[in-house]
Structure formats: structure tokens, C-alpha cells
């Protein structure tokens, strides 16, 4: 395989400023991709752009986007086409976890928090798909971020789990709709990944799980995953090495669910 398998390919990413999105952007840049990066954190996007252009000598544009707002998402994708002339792939990785995760059940669910979590995670993915599929090149590829919580239920996790289940439904629907154009749509389902979002979630409940502790999940590999490891999966699904994979929800959880 070429060390630059994404040369001349244009890839759009949401959630690019931190965690899995950040590591995916860096990996794709190292493999020659031309990137259109979106996030709500504009300063961090600019830092990533400067680092990717300097280190990998690739073309990068950035846009501050609230994925809950379709107008902003569509304007970002139109900007991508204006700058690069095409869109070969996208990774919709923007996401948030609720402050009440692990603390409040459905009866106690704050509805403003519900709307925010569903808005970013589920509506944000829908908005991204809607804008991207209007312009996606034939034989393109899209990766959406679901979660282990999109595959299994968990108490006191209503908004996040519902959103992540919904993303799998969106992914399967999109795959059926655009398969005739050779466009593939898949979902990744990470487990415990060491990211700022995981740290924030654990801080909110005052519980920091450590491998080997009594309350650590039954993860076969006995550790948290790294964002770089998930980025490798995203890159594979965007690449020409996965051309017969579509409509899939792929776990990357260290053997948590097995």
C-alpha cells in the first residue's frame, strides 16, 4: 500500500479539534489528504491547520460550525466544494456526553440537556449527512460516530444512548439510499477511549475508573483505547481498502461486548 493513500482526496471532518476527530485529522494529513475541518472550537482548529500544513504540506481549510444548525453545516460543505472542487469522503465525529450521564434516570431527565445531546450527536450527524450527500463524489465514503452505547442500553444514559442508537439507524438508511452510487456509509462504535470527553464525563460523576479496579468494565484487553487507535479504523473505512464494507456498525472496544 502507498504511504500516501489519500493523496488528492478531499475529506471533511466534524469534531476535528479534539479527541478522535483530532487524531483522525492528523492521520489523514500524514497520508496526503486535503482536509476541510469543522468544529465549534475555532482556535484549536487554527492550531491544527497550522501544524498539519507545516508538518505534512497538505491543503487544510477550517470552519467554525455548530452542527446542530443545518445552515452552518451546509455553508461549510459548500465552502469545501468551492475550495477543493469535490468531496471524496467525510467523518462525522462531533459529539458530546451529557453532564448527567450515570447520575440521572429517565424520570429525572433534564429536557434541555436531552435536546442539546440529541442536537449535537444525532441531529448534527443528520445535518452533516444531508449536506455531504448532496455533493459527495461517486464511490465516496462516510463514517459516522456511534458508540458501544449505540449497541447496548445502559441505565442513566438515556440521551446519549438514544442518540448513538439513532446514528446507527441513520447510517444504515443512508447506506441503502446511496449504495447505487458506490458511496459507502458506516458507523464506528467506540468503547472506553481516552479522550477529553471521557475525562469530562468521569469528572461529572466523580468516578475515575482504572484498569484492574473492581468497577472497571469487563474489557478483554484490560485497558482504555487511545484516540489514535480509533483514527486508524476511521481511515480504513474512508480508504479504498474497505470498498465492500457499507451499512456496518463496527465495534472498537477492546473486547468489551464480546
Swiss-Prot record:
**Which Pfam families has this protein been placed in?**
adh_short_C2 (PF13561)
Does the keyword section mention Oxidoreductase? yes
Record EC number = 1.1.1.-
- Say yes or no: keyword Ubl conjugation present: no
Superkingdom field? Eukaryota
Q: Please give a single GO biological process term from the UniProt record.
A: abscisic acid biosynthetic process
Q: What induces it?
A: Constitutively expressed at a low level.
Q: What is this protein called?
A: Short-chain dehydrogenase/reductase aba4
- Record keywords, A-Z: NADP, Oxidoreductase, Virulence
**Native species:** Botryotinia fuckeliana (Noble rot fungus)
Deletion phenotype = Reduces the production of abscisic acid (ABA) and accumulates a compound that corresponds probably to 1',4'-trans-diol-ABA.
Task: State its role.
Answer: Short-chain dehydrogenase/reductase; part of the gene cluster that mediates the biosynthesis of abscisic acid (ABA), a phytohormone that acts antagonistically toward salicylic acid (SA), jasmonic acid (JA) and ethylene (ETH) signaling, to impede plant defense responses. The first step of the pathway catalyzes the reaction from farnesyl diphosphate to alpha-ionylideneethane performed by the alpha-ionylideneethane synthase aba3 via a three-step reaction mechanism involving 2 neutral intermediates, beta-farnesene and allofarnesene.
Active-site residues, record numbering mapped to chain: 146 (proton donor), 160 (proton donor), 164 (lowers pka of active site tyr)
What InterPro entries does its record include?
NAD(P)-bd_dom_sf, Sc_DH/Rdtase_CS, SDR_fam
| Family membership | Belongs to the short-chain dehydrogenases/reductases (SDR) family.
Binding residues for NADP(+):
20, 66, 130, 160, 164, 193, 195
> Which PANTHER family does the protein's record reference?
DEHYDROGENASES, SHORT CHAIN, ESTRADIOL 17-BETA-DEHYDROGENASE 8-RELATED
Pathway connected to this protein: Hormone biosynthesis
GO function terms (MF aspect): oxidoreductase activity
Q: Which gene encodes it?
A: aba4
Amino acid at each position: 500500500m502507498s504511504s500516501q493513500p489519500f493523496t488528492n482526496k478531499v475529506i471533511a471532518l466534524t469534531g476535528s479539534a479534539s479527541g478522535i476527530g483530532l487524531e483522525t485529522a492528523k492521520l489523514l494529513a500524514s497520508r496526503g489528504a486535503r482536509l476541510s475541518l469543522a468544529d465549534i472550537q475555532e482556535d484549536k482548529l487554527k492550531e491544527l491547520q497550522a501544524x498539519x500544513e507545516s508538518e505534512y504540506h497538505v491543503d487544510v481549510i477550517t470552519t467554525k460550525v455548530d452542527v446542530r444548525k443545518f445552515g452552518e453545516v451546509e455553508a461549510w460543505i459548500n465552502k469545501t466544494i468551492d475550495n477543493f472542487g469535490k468531496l471524496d469522503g467525510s467523518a462525522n465525529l462531533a459529539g458530546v456526553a451529557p453532564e448527567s450521564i450515570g447520575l440521572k434516570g429517565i424520570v429525572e431527565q433534564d429536557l434541555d440537556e436531552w435536546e442539546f445531546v440529541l442536537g449535537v450527536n444525532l441531529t448534527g450527524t443528520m445535518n452533516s449527512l444531508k449536506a455531504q450527500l448532496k455533493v459527495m463524489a461517486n464511490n465516496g465514503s462516510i463514517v459516522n460516530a456511534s458508540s458501544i452505547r449505540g449497541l447496548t442500553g445502559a441505565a442513566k444514559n438515556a440521551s446519549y444512548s438514544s442518540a448513538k442508537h439513532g446514528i446507527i439507524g441513520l447510517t444504515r438508511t443512508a447506506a441503502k439510499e446511496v449504495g447505487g452510487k458506490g458511496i459507502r456509509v458506516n458507523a464506528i462504535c467506540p468503547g472506553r477511549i481516552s479522550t477529553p470527553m471521557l475525562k469530562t464525563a468521569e469528572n461529572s460523576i466523580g468516578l475515575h475508573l482504572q484498569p484492574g479496579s473492581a468497577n472497571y468494565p469487563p474489557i478483554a484487553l484490560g485497558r482504555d483505547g487511545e484516540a489514535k487507535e480509533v483514527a486508524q479504523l476511521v481511515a480504513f473505512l474512508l480508504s479504498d481498502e474497505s470498498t465492500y464494507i457499507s451499512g456496518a456498525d463496527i465495534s472498537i472496544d477492546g473486547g468489551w461486548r464480546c
